[in-house]
Curated annotation (Swiss-Prot):
It is found in: Cell membrane. PANTHER family: C-TYPE LECTIN DOMAIN FAMILY 2 MEMBER D-RELATED (PTHR45710:SF19), C-TYPE LECTIN DOMAIN-CONTAINING PROTEIN 180 (PTHR45710). GO terms for molecular function: carbohydrate binding; natural killer cell lectin-like receptor binding; transmembrane signaling receptor activity. Pfam families: Lectin_C. Inhibits osteoclast formation. Receptor for KLRB1F. Enhances T-cell activation. Plays a role in splenocyte activation, T-cell responses and IL-2 production. This is C-type lectin domain family 2 member I. The lineage of its organism: Eukaryota, Metazoa, Chordata, Craniata, Vertebrata. Disulfide bonds join 92-103, 120-202. Keywords: Cell membrane, Disulfide bond, Glycoprotein, Lectin, Membrane, Receptor, Signal-anchor, Transmembrane, Transmembrane helix. Residues 99-203 form the C-type lectin domain. Residues 1-53 are cytoplasmic. Detected in osteoblasts, growth plate chondrocytes and skeletal muscle overlying the bone (at protein level). Detected in spleen, B-cells, dendritic cells, thymus, and in IL2-activated natural killer cells. Glycans are attached at residue 112. It is a single-pass type II membrane protein.
């Protein structure tokens, strides 16, 4: 510890820099008892915060920063998932059921193929079209025990099956019978003449882009 070199000075040391301050001795004289000055003394002022504590504080700040970033990413992911859910399940209007990118309507009474197609067109749809096995399985299960007209037809037994928009059927499931109009039974696709009354199924692409809303922040 540094010593004061001058009498009457009181030394305070901070960061190893010495400072001397005069401090008279208490007494009756102007400078203390008998006019004497107390010999200077040195004191060291030491910071109360240790480097270890500072490092701990830095560590806590870093951990909190990482936690905030992780939370922001999680909230952003949740927001994206909510938008996707709205697209998948909130797209179809009342009495229509959504699967994938389509909406399906199942009739409540039987009519012939021509009437069924006209009804679907009035709803801005067509007699049902399926493009994959998942959609076909859904239609078979959801229609119940009824045979239902779908959107496949052909000009004759010598011609290929087509959908109502005139695109050819890919024969992913064979169509039984010699009729010109197809219907869906419980476990197969069959054909018959158009005038027979059956239930029917309409389908159309969903319009989720018009209904999708971003959740509030």
């Amino acid at each position: 510890m540094p010593d004061c070199l001058e009498t009457g000075e009181k030394l305070f040391v901070h960061n190893m820099n010495a400072q001397c301050v005069q401090k008279p001795e208490e007494g009756n004289g102007p400078l203390g008892t008998g006019g004497k000055i107390v010999q200077g003394k040195c004191f060291r002022i030491i910071s109360t915060v240790s480097p270890v504590k500072l490092y701990c504080c830095y560590g806590v700040i870093m951990v909190l920063t990482v936690a905030v970033i992780a939370l922001s990413v999680a909230l952003s992911t949740k927001k994206t998932e909510q938008i996707i859910i709205n697209k998948t399940y909130a797209a179809c209007s009342k009495n229509w059921t959504g699967v994938g990118n389509k909406c399906f309507y199942f009739s409540g009474y039987p009519r012939n193929w021509t009437f069924a197609q006209a009804f679907c067109m009035a709803q801005e749809a067509q007699l049902a079209r399926f493009d994959n096995e998942e959609e076909l399985i859904f239609l078979k299960r959801f229609k119940g025990d009824f045979d239902c007209w779908i959107g496949l037809h052909r000009e004759s037994s010598e011609h290929p099956w087509k959908w109502t928009n005139n695109t050819e059927y890919n024969n992913m499931n064979p169509i039984l019978g010699v009729g010109r109009y197809a219907y869906l039974s419980s476990d197969r696709i069959s054909s018959s003449r158009s005038y027979i009354n059956r239930m029917w199924i309409c389908s159309k692409l969903n319009n989720y882009n018009l209904h999708c809303q971003t959740p509030p922040v």
